[in-house]
UniProtKB/Swiss-Prot annotation:
Protein name: Zinc finger protein 682
Stored SMART domains: KRAB (SM00349), ZnF_C2H2 (SM00355)
Organism: Homo sapiens (Human)
InterPro entries: KRAB, KRAB_dom_sf, Krueppel_C2H2_ZnFinger, Znf_C2H2_sf, Znf_C2H2_type
Keywords: DNA-binding, Metal-binding, Nucleus, Repeat, Transcription, Transcription regulation, Zinc, Zinc-finger
GO MF annotation, one: zinc ion binding
Name of the gene: ZNF682
């Protein structure tokens, strides 16, 4: 067999083939061809410099070099294969065609060539091919043959195509959007759905669409009520495996998510992320109606029901409606008597985690919620929220009957009794009823005859603070009650009616 020449390790392209390569592939081609030539020179296997090398060294296009034979067009490949193939694979395909061109006359199909010489046939042509390729492989950089454990020569392009597809142990298909690489084109096609708005899987129950069939399968459990994942500790079942994994941390006490600012640890990632916003002050969720901002999306969702008045969650026991599912869950525990949240200090149990958190402040004496306007501190976040309305003037609770608005829901509830005539607070002494608890408290002093409010000037005592204030105005000579028609002023507003 003749000595290996540069033509033996040359990959040649026609104009159409060269334009088919992208800039990265063209650059790789230049680099590999120049490196092959240097390797042959170092081995003393070439004398004159080929025209191709001269053109490549001058960074000229190689495709119009005069060639001794016509290069067959590459096997037909669909556009989605060629655009996703990595440069290395294109190089390998071309190199295999060069080998096929030189040794195709042997008439052999699927000839296995291994570096250790196994399975090389007794045929003289086979041995020549093996020796030539073995020598050639030693001069080629590893990037051309990323897998050189098995190199095949094919006499038919169909066999070459099949082999290219079989070599999927290498990740050959690259996503042009994010650069991720896949072993098969089907894997790449499946992945590409992420970058598009296309949603192929539709739920027949509710019409919701999903990108993945596995997501649809999980979603269907909402409709079927299927909960295949059961906790061995407490027997609680879940729709998804991930939910069970998270739940188990309650029993193990594992809290893998720790805040670097305050050291507080959490069972789950989502409350940890929410907690971080307390330190940063970040409030990314803004109400479009009033402009109020929240650090949790769930808080914004709850807040929005104030504007809509919508209460879609109804208790089956008593018919009471709520604007949020979690509030209904907590309410239902009043019927069942369930109190799953227990205080470790005193053993007292509660039906919601938020009430337990607020209760714990009693033991610690901590007042962690501070008003930024007046520096007043509060034990509970709900107290701070209500207090802030004094500064903002916000009155989110509106009466549907008369349109009057209030700072707090409790005041709206009391106000509504004016329209309904409801008086739920009864005096045990005389049976008189009142629509507000504060009115009943004032009334009771009539029976106890306690005069707690004493004038510092004259020592006179009064049952009510308002009576003491009126008394003080008389002493100062103030006449705060003015008649609008004639402008006459009086000490007591009761004098206006006489």
């Amino acid at each position: 067999m003749e000595l290996l020449t540069f033509r033996d390790v040359t990959i040649e392209f026609s104009l159409e083939e060269w334009e088919f390569l992208n800039p990265a592939q063209q650059s790789l081609y230049r680099k590999v061809m120049l490196e092959n030539y240097r390797n042959l020179v170092s081995l003393g296997l070439t004398v004159s410099k080929p025209e191709l090398i001269s053109r490549l060294e001058q960074r000229q296009e190689p495709w119009n070099v005069k060639r001794h034979e016509t290069i067959a067009k590459p096997p037909a490949m669909s556009s989605h294969y060629t655009e996703d193939l990595l440069p290395e694979q294109c190089m390998q395909d071309s190199f295999q065609k060069v080998i096929l061109r030189r040794y195709g006359s042997c008439g052999l199909e699927d000839l296995h060539l291994r570096k250790d010489g196994e399975n090389v046939g007794e045929c003289k042509d086979q041995k020549e091919i093996y020796n030539g390729l073995n020598q050639c492989l030693s001069t080629l950089p590893s990037k051309i043959f990323p897998y050189n454990k098995c190199v095949k020569v094919f006499s038919k392009s169909s066999n070459l195509n099949r082999e290219n597809i079989r070599h999927t142990t290498e990740k050959l298909f690259k996503c042009m959007q994010c650069g991720k690489v896949f072993k098969s084109h089907s894997g790449l096609s499946y992945h590409k759905i992420i970058h598009t708005e296309e949603k192929l899987c539709i739920c027949e129950e509710c019409g919701k669409t999903f990108k993945w069939f596995s997501y649809l399968t999980k979603h269907k459990r909402i409709h079927t009520g299927e909960k295949p994942y059961k906790c061995e500790e407490c027997g609680k079942a879940f729709n998804w495996c991930s939910s069970l994994t998270k739940h188990k941390r309650i029993h193990t006490g594992e809290k893998p998510y720790k805040c670097e600012e305050c050291g507080k640890a959490f069972h789950w990632c989502s409350p940890f992320v929410r907690h971080k916003k307390i330190h940063t002050g970040e409030k990314p969720y803004t109400c479009e109606d009033c402009g109020r901002a929240f650090n949790r999306h769930s808080h914004l969702t709850k807040h929005k029901t104030i504007h809509t008045g919508k209460k879609p969650y109804k208790c089956k026991e008593c018919g009471k409606a709520f604007n949020h599912c979690s509030l209904l869950t907590i309410h239902e525990r009043t019927h069942t008597g369930e109190k799953p949240y227990k205080c470790e200090e005193c053993g007292k149990a509660f039906n919601s985690s938020s009430i337990l958190t607020e209760h714990k402040v009693i033991h610690s004496g901590e007042k962690p919620y501070k008003c930024e306007k007046c520096d007043k501190v509060f034990k509970r976040f709900s107290y701070l929220t209500k207090h802030k309305r004094i500064h903002t003037g916000e009155k989110p609770y509106k009466c549907e009957e008369c349109g009057k608005a209030f700072n707090w829901s409790s005041i709206l509830t009391e106000h509504k009794r004016i329209h309904t005539g409801e008086k739920p607070y009864n005096c045990e002494e005389c049976g008189k009823a009142f629509n507000r608890c504060s009115h009943l408290t004032r009334h009771k002093k009539i029976h106890t005859a306690v005069k707690r409010y004493k004038c510092e000037e004259c020592g006179k005592a009064f049952k009510r603070c308002s009576h003491l204030n009126e008394h003080k105005r008389v002493q100062r000579g103030e006449k705060s009650c003015k008649y609008k028609k004639c402008g006459e002023a009086f000490n007591h507003c009761s004098n206006l009616t006489t």
